[in-house]
């Protein structure tokens, strides 16, 4: 544990730009001792991970029980880009692949990871950080994490972008006491009045008539909001909100919420604040 603490402190102090030889600067041990620990030391990764998870659960769930505030389970993925693919690198990087970057809109070479955060009353802690190597889907990774979460003491929410709004994940989190709040792609099927229709088709019809929109105010800004309550494929009694700024009641051609756009809204769970600028969201029925 002392070696790990020395390594972590060195990483933070150097701003993630140091070398392994810097580890000894913050340790009472010689650098060769730390090198031996890195090369030959043995520790149980799962034990370390389980200890971290138990600590995070204890802190977040205790805060929820004390304050009555919701527990937020926040999921997102990111790519740590590398400058050269393995085919051109002098020393190939282990477990680096080409991944589709939705931020860059193209294939990106590097490590991709799925991060799961737990939050309550302003406290945000990292619960899990899982490397994605294509041997198991990101949907299955998040579902397995959902299954291991204890049922929270208060009504709680799972927050995600459109890539994780799937039947499997929503139903698994529901079983653990979490409602899902997330973005929807515009090709998702809805069933208004029992008629199957893509979300973008429904939105286009509504934008022409301007009917059934409610004008709401969030932080002194006005939005037109349309509420659909009904079925999605594999999900019963879902709520979908379409919202647009008051002066821009139009349907954008591409209406998908990216990870970057999601982050400013993740800490808000009241529905108008979660659904702005033409973004589409899934909400549990109230």
Model-found features: residue ranges?
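Generic detector of short, locally flexible boundary/turn motifs and exposed helical patches
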Residues: 1, 31-40, 78-83, 91-93, ...
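Contiguous N-terminal and early-domain "leader" segments and peripheral loops that mark the onset or edge
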Residues: 1-3, 110-116, 236, 240
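Gly/serine-rich nucleotide phosphate-binding loop at the start of the catalytic core
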Residues: 1-48, 52-53
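Single, function-defining residue in the core of a domain
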Residues: 4, 15-16, 27, 67-69, ...
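Active-site-proximal, Lys/Arg-enriched surface segment
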Residues: 10, 40-121, 222-227
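Long, contiguous hydrophobic alpha-helical segments, chiefly transmembrane helices and signal peptides
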Residues: 20, 34-37, 73-74, 113, ...
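Generic detector of isolated residues embedded in canonical secondary-structure elements
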Residues: 22, 30-33, 115, 179, ...
């Amino acid at each position: 544990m002392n070696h790990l603490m020395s390594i972590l402190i060195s990483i933070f102090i150097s701003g993630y730009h140091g070398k392994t030889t810097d580890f000894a600067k913050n340790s009472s041990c010689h650098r060769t001792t730390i090198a031996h620990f890195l090369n030959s030391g043995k520790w149980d990764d799962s034990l370390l991970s389980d200890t971290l998870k138990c600590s995070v659960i204890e802190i977040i769930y205790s805060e929820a029980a004390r304050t009555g505030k919701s527990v937020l389970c926040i999921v997102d993925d990111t790519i740590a880009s590398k400058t050269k693919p393995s085919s051109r690198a002098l020393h190939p990087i282990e477990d680096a692949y080409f991944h589709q970057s939705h931020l860059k809109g193209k294939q990106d070479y590097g490590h991709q990871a799925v991060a799961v955060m737990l939050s309550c009353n302003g406290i945000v802690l990292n619960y899990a950080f899982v490397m994605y190597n294509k041997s198991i889907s990101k949907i299955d990774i998040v579902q397995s994490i959902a299954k291991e979460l204890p049922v929270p003491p208060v009504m709680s929410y799972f927050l995600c972008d459109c890539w994780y709004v799937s039947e499997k994940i929503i139903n698994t989190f529901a079983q653990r006491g979490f409602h899902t709040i997330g973005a929807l792609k515009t090709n998702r099927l809805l069933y208004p009045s029992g008629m199957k229709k893509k979300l973008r088709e429904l939105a286009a019809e509504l934008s022409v008539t301007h009917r059934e929109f409610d004008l709401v105010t969030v932080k002194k800004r006005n939005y037109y909001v349309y509420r659909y309550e009904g079925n999605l494929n594999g999900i019963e009694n879902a709520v979908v909100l379409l919202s647009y700024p008051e002066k821009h009641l139009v349907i954008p051609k591409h209406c998908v919420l990216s990870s970057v756009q999601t982050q400013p809204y993740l800490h808000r769970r009241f529905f108008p604040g979660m659904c702005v600028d033409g973004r589409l969201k899934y909400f549990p029925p109230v």
